[in-house]
Amino acid sequence: MCIRDRFDATENLDGFVTISNTLKTCAVNLSKMCNDLRLLSSGPRTGFGEINLPPMQNGSSIMPGKINPVIPEVVTQVAFHVIGNDTTITMAAEAGQMELNAFEPVVFYSLFSSITSMTGAVNTLVKNCILGITANEKRCEDLVSKSVGITTALCPYIGYQKAASIAKKSLKTCLLYTSPSPR
């Protein structure tokens, strides 16, 4: 960071607040992605189950065979930590008085902690989770075959009303979409 006004730099820590806020924004987005991964991998029977995360430890103590999404969970916890550090940095920047802010030590500590934690979390997420994600093809095929959303593709050909009628009938009768037979 280039300091243009050294007097301002001893009074105000807004540059550090900006950096911390950017880290917080990254943490929020990373946490949201991890929550999506947890939801998409939930199961084995009653969740979404559309993707498989690499198993990192023995499953749940209350549900043998279940794979817990431990990597997305730990990354989400790091995001909570970074968000908390951002609050600390914001409060420390605000707590300065007049020409001096005596709370720079906690700002530096929190900022370096956030950077270190986020770096480790991203590396762990990529190495131990993202690179090992696979699609649960059987589950996805099953969901597509039971989806009435596929009738949307019919709208340009038969109109919205007829497509909606087919969708409603499919829901009532549990008729499934199947691929056309090869000829």
Regions found by a protein language model. Give the residues of each.
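Generic, well-ordered alpha-helical scaffold segments in large soluble proteins
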Residues: 22, 26-29, 36, 78-81, ...
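Short acidic (Asp/Glu) and glycine-rich catalytic loops that position anionic groups and cofactors
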Residues: 51-59, 91-101, 144-148, 160
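Long, amphipathic alpha-helical stalk/connector segments used for oligomerization, subunit docking
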Residues: 81-144
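A short structural micro-motif
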Residues: 9, 98, 172-173
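Feature representing long, continuous alpha-helical segments
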Residues: 17, 35, 61, 69, ...
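Internal glycine-rich alpha/beta core junctions
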Residues: 4-89
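Conserved small/polar residues in nucleotide/adenosyl-binding loops
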Residues: 1-5, 177-182
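Amphipathic, charged-and-aliphatic alpha-helical interface segments
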Residues: 157-174
